[in-house]
Regions:
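A beta-strand signature from Gram-negative outer-membrane beta-barrel systems
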Residues: 96, 154-155, 199-242, 251-253, ...
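Periplasmic N-terminal accessory/gating domains of Gram-negative outer-membrane beta-barrel systems
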Residues: 90, 109-176, 182-215, 232
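Outer membrane beta-barrel strand-and-loop segments of large Gram-negative receptors
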Residues: 380-384, 424, 432-434, 537-543, ...
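C-terminal beta-signal and adjacent terminal beta-strands/loops
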Residues: 662, 671-688, 705-709, 713-775
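Signature of Gram-negative outer-membrane beta-barrel scaffolds
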Residues: 403-506, 519, 635-638
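Periplasm-facing N-terminal accessory domains of Gram-negative outer-membrane beta-barrel systems
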Residues: 20-109, 446
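Gram-negative outer-membrane beta-barrel transporters
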Residues: 570-573, 592-681
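Surface-exposed extracellular loop regions of Gram-negative outer-membrane beta-barrel proteins
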Residues: 360-361, 407-416, 459-473, 505-550, ...
Length: 775
């Protein structure tokens, strides 16, 4: 009897233990049409309240719950929901594909976005703009080329650097304070044709995320923002050919399986052909002129095992401008990324990356058989290791490290002209490193919090000569260092925090704080980014930039998430901002560090966006009220002055109207305060030469900027294996002369006085593009 009782008790204990045990369901979620990973998809348990998870950047999910039989619901905006029933008595792996909704594929009254319903309310992160190329396909742009950077410039807190310029400013920061990544590789110049296009071919892009505050701890190296651009992986089920033919540019994309359902590739190219039109010119010097750019995106991936996957991706872009074989100017980016994904356990995901990045430019002048050539470059080799660890359903841990070896070649001059000697600025070397840890935690159904810290270090090293300067910029000494010898080591702790207080399922209040250190600096004498800007490291003289930002936002959804209201305020303090002493020169200056001065800055503002996400009529209104100010001891008599990116008012209106299955209308309107600029206050003569006299830094304003663009997309009847449409757009419909530049010259009608000459780039610019896809 005692034995039976003991066995019975043992059986009850074992049964209780089984019920107390927890098991993990994990796997990957992919697109059922092309096999690409789906990021940020939701997996919830039907039988358990507030129990769920989301996929990471590679479509991996992990959910740990007590043993039992459950219904798992898989959701993603733009896809049909899928449910599966699983008896969970052990750890299991379940990979799944979601099928795009028929309404989405037929382009009916549903707006495709990467943001799920209420996701803007519940996520801990704030000030994140996310979209896919599909979201922007009808927005009218210059020359008819879809451009993710131009679209970002229509959102709050992001300001265009000017007409025909792909540079952008985020919350009062400089153009060089944005970390721009393409498949994890830094892009040091994101512009083509001096800024008329960005380097991102939308046919090769999967999704785009811009972080303005509460920046996750895995990102480091820039003071203001992170633009993370991910390339498409290619269709692993069938071959596709797509492309577009425009007035000045065309593009072509080929993708398909390497082995069906196991691996895929994508090759996407784009080229302008303005130089072909110049060949029709009657002027001989124009016939030989070259003016074009090209870019090529390549990517391949392969599943080695059910737990291991390899990626190889690259980007190669080049601009070429030459005039009559007398002057040539070339610049371009090259990047490469090798990645290894591994599902380490049911709860841990690993990504190991080796990244290469290079930017270089060169211009040459030919005269009388002699030639002069000037060039510069920056090159990175980067090793990254990231882990995602799903601790439980309330805590998701992310940690890792990266090490970057920078090589700076600031400038070299080679000449066959007898009057000019060859000259080279010494190369510079640095090792940048970062270690981070971050947890994304949910506390009940009322609070989401993401907190973490990043340690960043920067080792400025030899081989090279380190100079020292006094307070006035005069060189006082120099010391030579051998290979890999530390000249100066900088390091910082960078805390990151984002919190979302969920007031209801329709509204939330968010706060964020982040500190960012920046060790690389772009030196420019112009008012906007150009290919000849110089990248320099933090050294024993050049100080790292530091940015501390606090932000608060209120988010509200209306009418079943059809309308979305976002309001945010922010304050940013900027330390060790860089400017130039009066008369400083950047061109082939081996002692440029002596011409730099350091100060502080502050940026603050209010941002508002009201968006309609569903229905035939969609779009948004965004408005930013902001200031960006700087203060330097040696500039402007030590008084605070507006930064060149200081724009008080910035308004954008974007509207898209789906008339029917065949026609879609779109329009954008932009207005913003003119840039702060420095103009001469007077002039004087020295030995007969007129010299301008400057007083207040950035004490004047360019005229206010405004522009209306309209577009029409015609969708032709699709065939089973063929889709095509025609996009017609007009840039600057009412042909307003927006000022690009102001120069000064002597007034011939009134000698002794100076008059201002305004130069505009574009008035009315029509464009037409034919797009197609062969399945």
């Amino acid at each position: 009897m005692k034995i039976k009782l003991t066995l019975f008790c043992f059986f009850i204990c074992c049964l209780s233990l089984v019920h107390a045990q927890k098991f993990t369901l994990s796997g990957t979620i992919k697109d059922g049409e092309n096999g690409e990973d789906i990021f940020d998809a939701t997996v919830v348990v039907k039988e358990l309240t507030n129990t769920g998870t989301k996929t990471n950047a590679y479509g991996f999910y992990s959910l740990t719950i007590p043993a039992g039989t459950y219904t798992f619901i898989y959701r993603m905006a733009g896809y049909d929901q899928k449910e599966i029933t699983v008896e969970l008595t052990e750890n299991k792996q379940h990979n799944l594909e979601l099928i795009p909704s028929k309404d989405i594929k037929n382009l009916q009254e549903v707006e495709v976005t990467a943001v799920k319903e209420n996701d803007n309310i519940t996520k801990s992160g704030m000030a994140v703009t996310t979209f896919t190329p599909k979201d922007i396909e009808t927005i009218p742009v210059l020359f008819g080329e879809k451009d993710i950077v131009k679209t970002l410039q229509l959102t709050p807190g992001v300001k265009a650097a000017g007409d025909g310029n792909a540079g952008f400013y985020v919350r009062g920061g400089g153009a060089d304070q944005n970390l721009v990544l393409l498949d994890e590789a830094p892009v040091y110049n994101a512009s083509h044709l001096l800024g008329f296009f960005s380097v991102f071919n939308s046919d090769a892009i999967k999704d785009v995320s811009l972080y303005k505050s509460g920046i996750p701890a895995q990102y480091g190296g820039r003071a203001s923002s992170v633009l993370d651009v991910k390339m498409r992986e290619g269709n692993n089920k069938r071959f596709n050919v797509s492309g577009g033919i425009g007035l000045i540019a065309s593009r072509l994309t080929v993708e398909g399986p390497i082995v069906k359902n196991k691996g895929s590739f994508i090759v996407s190219g784009r080229r302008t052909y303005m130089d072909l039109f110049l060949k029709a010119s009657r002027k001989p010097e124009l016939k030989s002129t070259k003016l074009y750019f090209y870019d090529l995106n390549l990517k391949a991936n392969y599943n080695i095992t059910s737990r291991d996957r390899l990626y190889l991706s690259g980007y190669f872009g080049r601009d070429n401008f030459s005039f009559n074989d007398e002057f040539g100017f070339k610049w371009g980016n090259g990047t490469g990324t090798i990645r290894w994904n591994r599902i380490v356990t049911e709860k841990m995901f690993s990504n190991t990356s080796f990244v290469f990045s290079n930017f270089n430019y060169a211009f040459d002048i030919t005269s009388g058989g002699s030639k002069l050539k000037v060039g510069a470059s920056i090159q990175d080799l980067n090793l990254k290791q990231d882990f995602d660890y799903f601790i439980n359903n309330s805590n998701s841990l992310k940690f890792g490290f990266n090490v970057i070896y920078h090589t700076f070649k600031p400038g070299e001059l080679k000449s066959t002209m007898s009057a000019i000697n060859n000259f080279k600025i010494d190369n510079q070397y640095a090792l940048e490193m970062g270690v981070y840890i971050q947890n994304d935690q949910k506390i009940g159904n009322w609070l989401s919090i993401m907190y973490g810290v990043r340690y960043s270090g920067f080792d400025y090293m030899g081989k090279g000569i380190a100079y020292s300067y006094d307070e006035k910029g005069k060189k006082t000494g120099e010391q030579e260092y051998g290979d890999f010898k530390t000249i100066k080591y900088h390091h910082f702790l960078e805390p990151r925090l984002s919190m979302s207080f969920i007031l209801s399922e329709k509204n939330s209040l968010k706060i964020a704080y982040n500190r960012n250190a920046q060790f690389l600096h772009q030196l420019s004498n112009s008012s906007s980014s150009s290919p000849t800007d110089i990248w320099v490291p933090s050294t024993n003289n050049v100080k790292p930039q530091i940015a501390d930002q606090v932000a608060m936002g209120y988010y509200r959804n209306f009418l079943d998430n059809m309308l979305v209201l976002t309001t945010e305020i922010y304050y940013k303090h900027l330390g060790n901002q860089i400017d130039y002493r009066n008369g400083a020169s950047l061109f082939l200056n081996n002692e440029i560090e002596g011409g730099l001065v350091y100060g502080t800055g502050q940026a603050y503002g209010f941002e508002l966006q009201f968006e309609k996400k569903k229905g035939k009529f969609t779009g948004w209104i965004s408005y930013t009220l902001s200031r960006s100010l700087r203060k330097f001891k040696d500039i402007n008599q030590g008084k605070q002055f507006p930064a060149r990116q200081d724009r008080i008012h910035d308004l954008s209106v974007v509207a898209m109207y789906r008339i029917n299955q065949k026609f879609a209308l779109s329009g954008t309107f932009v207005f913003y305060t003119g840039d702060a600029v420095t103009f001469p206050s007077g002039k004087y003569e020295i030995n007969g030469a007129v010299v301008p006299y400057y007083t207040e830094r950035n004490g004047y304003r360019m005229p206010n900027y405004h522009r209306l663009d309209l577009g029409l997309t015609v969708y032709f009847k699709d065939r089973p294996k063929f889709e095509h449409n025609l996009n017609v757009s007009i840039y600057n419909v009412y042909a307003h002369r927006n000022t690009f530049m102001i120069s000064f010259e002597e007034d011939k009608d009134n000698p002794g006085k100076t008059k201002a000459i305004q130069t505009s780039l574009f008035r009315l610019v029509p464009s037409i593009t034919y797009n197609f896809k062969i399945k």
